[in-house]
């Protein structure tokens, strides 16, 4: 999904690419904090505020990638890499992630959720200037504003406990406004996209290979 950022990412993008709010080529929306809803019985709304003089953002990943690749800061070669030995570089960020359960470079992590339903709805009249994280009977849902007068919804749940149909029903009942296709962000046509995922971590995130190159493991497949 990857739309939200932390405060330091905004500073880095400004320093490296000169990204600004007027041109906004990455289709960013302001993120002034994080609102946790219904996670506590005593306090239904817990707001994690950022310092008043700082700001994070939510971006469209597709446009953020395009902006960085077109920045002119480095040469870009497009291709499918299956063997890192074919890459001529001193430092390699391997963002392919773990695609093989027998991959000895990664180990699984326990996570109570392992699937997400993605959809889009129209934006509310009043602008949302923070990320919403809403507790649900099956897990939680992220609610993120976009620049296209839409809002992204991600209903996160455990597919081994909650069936897909039950999750879809609860999603539509709790967020009836999330009824449009996520296709503008991803190559999907259906209104609600189900995306299962696994949680894992690299046993050795940074290592030196036999050729003396620094390999940094990161990312998901």
Please place each PLM-identified region on the residue numbering.
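N-terminal FAD cofactor-binding segment of flavoenzymes
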Residues: 1-45
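Glycine-/proline-rich flexible loop or hinge segments
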Residues: 1, 48-54, 149-154
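Short, glycine/charge-rich beta-strand/loop segments that flank catalytic centers
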Residues: 26-36, 80-82, 187-196
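FAD/FMN-dependent oxidoreductases across multiple families
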Residues: 58, 147-149, 156-221
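General structural concept
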Residues: 1, 9, 13, 17, ...
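Short secondary-structure capping/junction motifs at helix and strand boundaries
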Residues: 19-24, 75-78, 180-181
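Mobile amphipathic helical/loop "lid" adjacent to a hydrophobic cofactor/ligand pocket
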Residues: 36-72
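Predominantly flavin-linked oxidoreductase catalytic cores and closely associated redox partners
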Residues: 62, 66-176
């Amino acid at each position: 999904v990857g739309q939200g950022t932390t405060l330091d990412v905004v500073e880095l993008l400004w320093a490296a690419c000169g990204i600004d709010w007027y041109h906004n080529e990455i289709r960013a929306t302001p993120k002034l904090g994080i609102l946790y809803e219904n996670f506590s019985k005593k306090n239904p709304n817990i707001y994690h505020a950022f310092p008043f003089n700082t700001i994070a953002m939510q971006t469209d990943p597709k446009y953020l990638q395009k902006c960085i690749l077109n920045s002119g800061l480095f040469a870009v070669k497009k291709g499918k890499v299956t063997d890192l030995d074919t890459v001529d570089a001193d430092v390699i960020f391997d963002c392919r992630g773990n695609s093989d359960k027998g991959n000895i470079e990664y180990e699984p992590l326990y996570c109570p959720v392992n699937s997400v339903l993605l959809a889009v709805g129209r934006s509310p009249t009043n602008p949302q200037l923070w990320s919403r994280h809403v507790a649900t009977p099956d897990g939680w849902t992220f609610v993120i504003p976009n620049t296209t007068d839409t809002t992204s919804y991600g209903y996160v749940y455990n597919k081994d406990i909650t069936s897909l149909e039950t999750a879809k029903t609860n999603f539509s009942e709790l967020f009836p406004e999330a009824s449009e296709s996520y296709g503008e962000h991803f190559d999907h046509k259906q209104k609600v996209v189900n995306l299962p995922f696994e949680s894992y971590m690299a046993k050795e995130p940074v290592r030196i290979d036999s050729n003396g190159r620094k390999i940094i493991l990161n990312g998901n497949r």
